[in-house]
Structures are given as C-alpha cells and as structure tokens.
Amino acid sequence: MTDLNLPSIFVPLVGLVFPAIAMTSLFLYVQKNKIV
C-alpha cells in the first residue's frame, strides 16, 4: 500500500467513470428531445 499504487487505480477509474457520466447525460438529453 504505497502512494504510487493509489494513482495507478484512481486514474483508470476516473478515465472510465467520467466518459460514462458524459454518455449518460448525452443519452438522457437525446431522449428528452425525442419525447418533446
């Protein structure tokens, strides 16, 4: 459990979570426009 191990796990996690949130926001935005 070193300080170098934390960014190793944290960076890919953010790299996957951030695009997932962006895709979800875009998906909800498109669905809202289709309904209205």
UniProtKB/Swiss-Prot annotation:
Task: Tell me where the transmembrane regions lie.
Answer: 9-29
What GO terms fall under cellular component here? Answer: chloroplast thylakoid membrane; photosystem I
Sorted alphabetically, which keywords does the UniProt record give? Chloroplast, Membrane, Photosynthesis, Photosystem I, Plastid, Thylakoid, Transmembrane, Transmembrane helix
**Principal cellular location given in the protein's record:** plastid
Gene Ontology annotations of biological process type: photosynthesis
SUPFAM superfamilies according to UniProt:
Subunit VIII of photosystem I reaction centre, PsaI
Regarding the membrane, this protein is recorded as:
Single-pass membrane protein
Superkingdom field: Eukaryota
Q: Where in the cell is it found?
A: Plastid, Chloroplast thylakoid membrane
Query: What's this protein's family per the entry?
Result: Belongs to the PsaI family.
NCBIfam families given for it? PS_I_psaI
What function does the entry list?
May help in the organization of the PsaL subunit.
The name this protein goes by in its record: Photosystem I reaction center subunit VIII
Protein species of origin = Sorghum bicolor
